[in-house]
Amino acid sequence: MPQPTSSDVHVDAILSNMSVAYMQEAYAFVAGRAFPTVNVQKQTDKYFTYSQADFFRDQVQRRADGTESAGTGYSLSTATYNAEVYALHKDIGDQTRANADIPLNMDMDATRILSQQMLIRQEVQWAADSFTTGVWGTDATPSPLWDAASSTPIADIETAKNTVLTNTGYVPNTVIMSYKVFSALVDNSDIVDRIKYTSQESVTEELLARLFGVDRVLIMAATYNTAAEGATASYSLVGDKDVLVCYTPANPGLMVPSAGYNMVWTGVSAGLGTGAAVSRYRIEERKADRIEIEAAFDFKIVSSALGYFLSNCTS
């Protein structure tokens, strides 16, 4: 069966921009916000990592007159990333388009469902890569759990911050939690008692950030259907009952430490410079137009010591 050639496939800037805007407005998803994004020109490549141990030694010495100063240095190693390509399409048949009240809306609707599913794929992938045990410098479980009357979530977060600070020299500035954990904290006495005499605010991400002493709290509120197409829908939240306390900079840099980076390959966007692109092309033998979304990314943990993972925070 004939296939479209590369010259037939057109990355649609309008649909791509609409897809990017939709992704940016989907606040239930944290994958695109958890780590700084690094746009990369190559799908897979190496990057340098600096020795943390060398940077944190106390090697400055007194200098006697006429003598050399003490010397130091640092070692470099390399790590790799691989921005896997993910894609999905939706075909719009000519008969379906002809029967539509507003034909243009069919392209927009296709872009929306493709964008939604790309968001889900990114969120599920980020959770599998980064929101789990065994990948960060420290794993712990609060005791008591945070839905218990005697629990101390503020102290538990402070313990996490102190651990990361001791091991890296950086105070964590980000707390990422599942919606199940957030729901438990809304009625947690350790939280509520701190604000009941001083504020009429309800418990929000911003209020938790102030109580925890971090720049931001991100709530994982994305849900998805785990059942196969045609089966009875079965919905599940992406995040379970866990919390990640980590340090991430506002902007990536060559010598800027971060718990992780989102490596985004721009090669799929045909010059738009984004990590996701929407193409539209003709499938003549099917008498249909194909709308296709494609993205390439790798959620890369760069420094495991800059993360502290709290699992099973509620019962």
Where are the language model's segments positioned?
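Sequence/fold signature of self-assembling virion shell proteins
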Residues: 2-62, 77-84, 145-151, 192-315
